[in-house]
C-alpha cells in the first residue's frame, strides 16, 4: 500500500491522509507479525508520526484494531460486489457467472510475484483472545456476508442445474469461502505465489463438475 508523507503536528483538514497512513502501516505490520506483535510504538515509528498525532486519530491500540477491520471489511464487500457484478455482466447463466467470478480471482492471484500478504480476518482470529467480542462479531458478519451471497448464487444454479450428487447449498458456499481463505494462507506458508491460483482452479473445476449434465 502507498504511504503518504507525514504531516507532523499539522493535521489535514479532515485528517484522512495521516489516518490512512497510520492504518496502512498498522495493517502491513499485523499481517507480518500478528496483532500481538504490533505495538503502538512500532506503528508510530514506522509511520513517522508523533504520539500526539497517533492518539489524535486512535485512542487505543484496540481502537486502531477495530478501525482496521472495519475498513478491511468494507473493502472486502466492494471487492466481492465488483467481481460478481462483472461476472453477471459477462454471462446470464448463474453457473457461468459463478465460474467467471472464481476465474476473476484466479486471474488476480496468477499475477502475484510474491505470496499474498495474508488475510486480516485470519490474523485476528488466530489471536481472538486479544481482541474484543465486537471485533470478532464484525469478522463473523463478513463470513456470513460471503456465505449468504454465494449461497444465493448457488440456489440459482441448483434451480437450473441439478447437482450430480446430493449437496447442502450453504456447505458448498462455505467450501468456496474456505478455499479462498485457505489458498492464501497455504501460499504464504509454502512461499509459493502460484499456489493460490492453483487451488482456486481446483475449486472452479469442482463447481463445474458438480453441476455438469449427467450423460
Where do the protein language model's features map onto the residues?
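N-terminal intrinsically disordered/low-complexity leader segments
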Residues: 1-17, 158, 213-215
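Amphipathic, non-transmembrane alpha-helical scaffold segments
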Residues: 15, 23, 69, 73, ...
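Helix-turn-helix
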Residues: 21, 25, 29-71
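Hydrophobic alpha-helical connector segments
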Residues: 67, 82-116, 169-176
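Amphipathic alpha-helical packing segments from all-alpha helical-bundle domains
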Residues: 77-78, 96-103, 116, 132-159, ...
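Amphipathic C-terminal alpha-helical segment
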Residues: 108, 112, 176-194, 208-215
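Amphipathic alpha-helical segments used for helix-helix packing
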Residues: 112-134
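Hydrophobic alpha-helical segments that form the core
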Residues: 117-118, 122-123, 167-186, 202-206
Amino acid at each position: 500500500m502507498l504511504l503518504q508523507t507525514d504531516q507532523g503536528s499539522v493535521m489535514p483538514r479532515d485528517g484522512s491522509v495521516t489516518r490512512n497512513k497510520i492504518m496502512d502501516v498498522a495493517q502491513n505490520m499485523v499481517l507480518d507479525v500478528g496483532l500481538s506483535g504490533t505495538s503502538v510504538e512500532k506503528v508510530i515509528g514506522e509511520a513517522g508520526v508523533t504520539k500526539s498525532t497517533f492518539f489524535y486519530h486512535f485512542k487505543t491500540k484496540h481502537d486502531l484494531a477495530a478501525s482496521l477491520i472495519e475498513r478491511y471489511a468494507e473493502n472486502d464487500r466492494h471487492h466481492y460486489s465488483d467481481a460478481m457484478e462483472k461476472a453477471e455482466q459477462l454471462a446470464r447463466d448463474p453457473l457461468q457467472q459463478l465460474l467467471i467470478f472464481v476465474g476473476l480471482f484466479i486471474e488476480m492471484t496468477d499475477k502475484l510475484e510474491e505470496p499474498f500478504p495474508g488475510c486480516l480476518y485470519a490474523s485476528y482470529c488466530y489471536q481472538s483472545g486479544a481482541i474484543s467480542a465486537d471485533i470478532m462479531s464484525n469478522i463473523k458478519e463478513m463470513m456470513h456476508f460471503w456465505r449468504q451471497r454465494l449461497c444465493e448464487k448457488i440456489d440459482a444454479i441448483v434451480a437450473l442445474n441439478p447437482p450430480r450428487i446430493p449437496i447442502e447449498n450453504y456447505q458448498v458456499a462455505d467450501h468456496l469461502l474456505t478455499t479462498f481463505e485457505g489458498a492464501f494462507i497455504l501460499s504464504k506458508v509454502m512461499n509459493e505465489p502460484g499456489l493460490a491460483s492453483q487451488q482456486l482452479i481446483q475449486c472452479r473445476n469442482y463447481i463445474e463438475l458438480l453441476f455438469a449434465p449427467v450423460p
